Amino acid sequence: VSSGAWLSSLAQKSRLAVVCEPGRPNGAFVRSRKGRAVWEVVFRGVAAHAGNNPQDGRSAILAAARFTLEVNQLQDYSGKGTSVNVGVIHGGTVCNTVPDLCKLTIDRRCCRDEDGQAIDDAIEALALRSCGNGIHVEAKRLSLSSAMPYSEKNRPLIELVNEAARLEGFEAQWADAG
């Protein structure tokens, strides 16, 4: 169950809206949120017995490990605020078999949608480059949500919240969410 489509339809009819995203430990309200994409990348190799004929195998896990090291280089957290995290890896069945399957799940976050698109393009290019020599790769973006940056367009709403907070006797604090 998702409220995304419903909220999107309401947004088309609204001038302003307050999103009640859970606050931060210091009680700050969230004024901006990074965009996010979730990727699944599936590596298929060739199974072989690790003792009798390992040379006939093509390790999906080894290909996924190389890909993971490369995709990790796409992040620029301290500069553009982008992060790329290979957070889930599933592969292999038993330790005496060259694994023919490995699946990765990637979380990508960006402050600007254009930076996110550049990283998504790079993930696809790295997946394509990982193919060959008995390894097949399929990269699929499972979900995408746009960044919600702080801007002059949402400043009036933030000022309304600031004023409401002052009327209640406190100063609103603001944070940017990842």
Where are these regions (language model features)?
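Metal-dependent amide/peptide-bond hydrolase catalytic core
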Residues: 22-27, 31, 37-42, 46-178
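Acidic/histidine-rich catalytic neighborhood of metal-dependent amide-processing enzymes
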Residues: 1-34
